Amino acid sequence: MKVRKGDTVLVISGKDKGAKGKVLVAYPDRNKVLVEGVNRIKKHTPESRTERGASSGGIVTQEAPISVSNVMLLDSDGKPTRVGYRRDDETGKNVRIAKSNGKDI
């Protein structure tokens, strides 16, 4: 999966199309990401249980995971881009690059 925790992404389809946010959690096995302020749902929780963003029970509004195919990574210029890889000569590790401008992400 080319999107990781901490990346800034743009939602390209769905009810929150056009929204920008930071990736809070990435779920590579499910191909989903949790984006800050996107795909908000209302969840009914019991009094004894604590969920994300709630100290006690009741109706809690929180983010739900969104498919990684519905988001696009933003490059250093703030424009949506596809992601590619190149091998770093010094370390020998793969580095993500923005296809739009060729810069490292």
Curated annotation (Swiss-Prot):
InterPro entries: KOW (IPR005824), Rib_uL2_dom2 (IPR014722), Ribosomal_uL24 (IPR003256), Ribosomal_uL24_CS (IPR005825), Ribosomal_uL24_KOW (IPR041988), Translation_prot_SH3-like_sf (IPR008991). The lineage of its organism: Bacteria, Bacillati, Actinomycetota, Actinomycetes, Mycobacteriales. The keyword Manganese does not apply. Coiled coil: none annotated. SMART domains: KOW (SM00739). This is Large ribosomal subunit protein uL24. CDD domains: KOW_RPL26 (cd06089). Gene3D superfamilies: 2.30.30.30. Belongs to the universal ribosomal protein uL24 family. One of its GO terms (molecular function) is rRNA binding. One of two assembly initiator proteins, it binds directly to the 5'-end of the 23S rRNA, where it nucleates assembly of the 50S subunit. One of the proteins that surrounds the polypeptide exit tunnel on the outside of the subunit. It comes from Mycolicibacterium vanbaalenii (strain DSM 7251 / JCM 13017 / BCRC 16820 / KCTC 9966 / NRRL B-24157 / PYR-1). It comes from the Bacteria. Keywords: Ribonucleoprotein, Ribosomal protein, RNA-binding, rRNA-binding.
